[in-house]
Swiss-Prot record:
Annotated organism of origin: Salmonella typhimurium (strain LT2 / SGSC1412 / ATCC 700720)
Annotated EC: 5.1.3.29
Protein family: Belongs to the RbsD / FucU family. FucU mutarotase subfamily.
Upper taxonomic lineage: Bacteria, Pseudomonadati, Pseudomonadota, Gammaproteobacteria, Enterobacterales
Subunit structure: Homodecamer.
GO terms (BP aspect): fucose metabolic process; fucosylation; L-fucose metabolic process
Subcellular localization, as worded in the UniProt entry: Cytoplasm
Coiled-coil ranges from the UniProt annotation: none
Pathway participation: Carbohydrate metabolism; L-fucose metabolism
Active site: 22 (proton donor)
Name by which UniProt lists this protein: L-fucose mutarotase
Binding site for substrate: 30, 107, 129-131
Keywords: Carbohydrate metabolism, Cytoplasm, Fucose metabolism, Isomerase
CC terms in the record's Gene Ontology section: cytoplasm
Catalytic reaction list: alpha-L-fucose = beta-L-fucose
Amino acid sequence: MLKTISPLISPTLLKVLAEMGHGDEIIFSDAHFPAHSLGPQVIRADGLSVSDLLRAIIPLFELDSYAPPLVMMAAVEGDTLDPNVEARYRDALSLEAPCPDIVRIDRYAFYERAQKAFAIVITGECAKYGNILLKKGVTP
């Protein structure tokens, strides 16, 4: 057993977080994201919300300080975003330091980034546009 590591972080996720290098990206996706068809390693975190997982990993994960470290999917034209989703993620990511800005990109650009990601974590999140990309930084 390891101490101070949240039980929400599976052994597989812990290994992936440790293997990632600076500049590598990981997606925490909602339950409807097409992770398996995009290519990178997929980790299942069924039943967990994205915000709970973000809260669990942020003490272990340094965000990139040289490039925008947080990216979310923009709403498709004619659709709307629930601002509470981003607010929950910001709150979770603010536990260790102020949350950096979150950049929004269109759905297909997000899918392209996901194809190049180190891994995709599929959660039980049901919020629309509930996907977020994190870019790993250099530890101080």
